[in-house]
Amino acid sequence: MLGPTWEPLAPTSMLGLEGPCWVGPGPDGGFAVSEEFGDVQLFGSAHQPLGSLGTLTGHNFGHPAGVCSDAEGSIIVADEQRHQVTLFPRVGPPICLQLEGLKRPLGMACAPQGQLVVADAGDNCIKLYQYLGEMA
């Protein structure tokens, strides 16, 4: 037996997405969805659309993949095509995190003490980076 049956909380459709690929937690109880065609859509805790990171910040993505948010409410996006990870703080411009050795970043998660765990499909491995507290 695998466990209890999972049922949807509410039958909700997020319309207007173009090739949704990855879903991750967003700030304030919301979530973020990366789209196959080059943007990341943000949704609030009541599932209401908040806009796209590209439109809100002027950032151009190659192929956004994994998304997550950190303890400070920043959204972090892996860009598979550009081989980079970008941090979108609550206030201010996007910051390209200088993470050495990324070949094809896909999934990621924020870990305790300001660490970022990245699944790098180009190297077939998981990479751990320290990013909070290390930026000047």
Swiss-Prot record:
Cysteines paired by S-S bonds: none
Residue ranges of NHL repeats: 48-91, 93-132
Cited Pfam families: NHL (PF01436)
Signal sequence annotation: none
Keyword annotations from UniProtKB, A to Z: Repeat
Protein name from the UniProt record: NHL-repeat-containing protein 4
Species in which this protein is naturally found: Mus musculus (Mouse)
